[in-house]
Amino acid sequence: MIFLLPPVIFVMLLAESVLILGDSEDADLMEMVQMSRPFFNPIIPAVEFVDLREERQRACGHLHDPCPNDRPGHRTCCIGLQCRYGSCLVQVGR
């Protein structure tokens, strides 16, 4: 288990150094770093994560909302919906 610790620490340091580089900060990378911190620092209150989840749910597109696909890999539709034909639609097979 101890041999896994150095690669994990290296990844965390690499992610933080990317954030320090400057103006090219990516919101998804920043969120990844924020979400991975509780694993190393359990003192952070859970209230912040509830607020983050509520903010993410408000920011997502609901049924028939437009969903521009200008950021590949970024989910613009709420959970259970997919971006099809420029709108948030129900997933195929449901």
From Swiss-Prot:
Chief location: secreted
Presence of keyword Signal: yes
Signal peptide: 1-22
A cellular component term, taken from the record's GO annotations: extracellular region
Alphabetized GO MF terms: ion channel regulator activity; toxin activity
Keywords: Disulfide bond, Ion channel impairing toxin, Knottin, Secreted, Signal, Toxin
Keyword Zinc assigned: no
Propiece residues: 23-58
Disulfide bridge map: C60-C78, C67-C83, C77-C88
Highest taxon of the lineage: Eukaryota
Tissues expressed in: Expressed by the venom gland.
Annotated domain remarks: The presence of a 'disulfide through disulfide knot' structurally defines this protein as a knottin.
Role noted for this protein: Probable ion channel inhibitor.
Sequence similarity: Belongs to the neurotoxin 14 (magi-1) family. OAIP-1 subfamily.
Stated name of the protein: U27-theraphotoxin-Cg1a
Species this chain originates from: Chilobrachys guangxiensis
